[in-house]
Swiss-Prot record:
Disulfide bonds: none annotated. The keyword ATP-binding does not apply. One of its GO terms (cellular component) is chloroplast thylakoid membrane. Belongs to the PsbI family. The chain crosses the membrane at residues 4-24. SUPFAM superfamilies: Photosystem II reaction center protein I, PsbI. It comes from Cyanidioschyzon merolae (strain NIES-3377 / 10D) (Unicellular red alga). This is Photosystem II reaction center protein I. Keywords: Chloroplast, Membrane, Photosynthesis, Photosystem II, Plastid, Reaction center, Thylakoid, Transmembrane, Transmembrane helix. It is found in: Plastid, Chloroplast thylakoid membrane. One of its GO terms (biological process) is photosynthesis. It holds the Pfam family PsbI. It is a single-pass membrane protein. PSII is composed of 1 copy each of membrane proteins PsbA, PsbB, PsbC, PsbD, PsbE, PsbF, PsbH, PsbI, PsbJ, PsbK, PsbL, PsbM, PsbT, PsbX, PsbY, PsbZ, Psb30/Ycf12, at least 3 peripheral proteins of the oxygen-evolving complex and a large number of cofactors. It forms dimeric complexes.
């Protein structure tokens, strides 16, 4: 049961960080050099 809980928390943190880093890297205000988003 403890192993399952640790596995679930790891997946949640992994996908959350993946979403956050992907959102930050795709944010035009943080990366003004990328003009292909417009």
């Amino acid at each position: 049961m403890l192993t399952l809980k640790i596995f679930v928390y790891t997946c949640v943190i992994f996908f959350s960080s993946l979403f956050i880093f992907g959102f930050l890297s795709n944010d035009p205000s943080r990366n003004p050099n990328r003009k292909d988003l417009e």
